């Protein structure tokens, strides 16, 4: 207990109430409908639809980053059009990362086994690292940067720190600072900003409007990533059509599409 509260019952009650409130916010998987400006009847996006949108926009983003950026003159014959297409592809692709973070938070909140949830994300992070290295350097090992799945896994560890250390704020804070430092040092995709975004979405999961505001504030790019954050408001809380083992196809899509793009980039265009 805080030493200052031992001789002050009023302060002790306030400290206890603050801890109880924080604990209820962290442990509850429910969303307060009053904190979503979109009426429930208009919330038409299921988790499966959000996954589909995330995958499609990510694919568009990576086509722009890895094919158009390096092979513009081949893909687009007219001079000057490659940069225009590159900009369009990357702008559309900015929608994907906020959705991946949001889905990660929703998965953490509703999973029945948080250890297995994290283990699966770690496994896909390791697999994805191979294709990430190939697409960036045409080598199996490239320590200079890490894939977005590493960022998401660090976000998972951050959510675990908040959930399991919620009664020990100093230890929780140290754990989060350490994870922020790791995300910066190993140069994860989206870096420390991406890690902080995921943690913020978790802390604000009961209020969709606050998630939207925090997301736009973090990425400071309403015209690009803002569309992804708007999708939060239309989420209906339902799983949708992707069920059972098919959910792993969503995660396998990331390394699989990078592998295909690597083959096109290096084997077709050279």
Where in the sequence are the language-model features?
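Alpha-helical transmembrane segments and their immediate juxtamembrane cytosolic regions
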Residues: 1-270
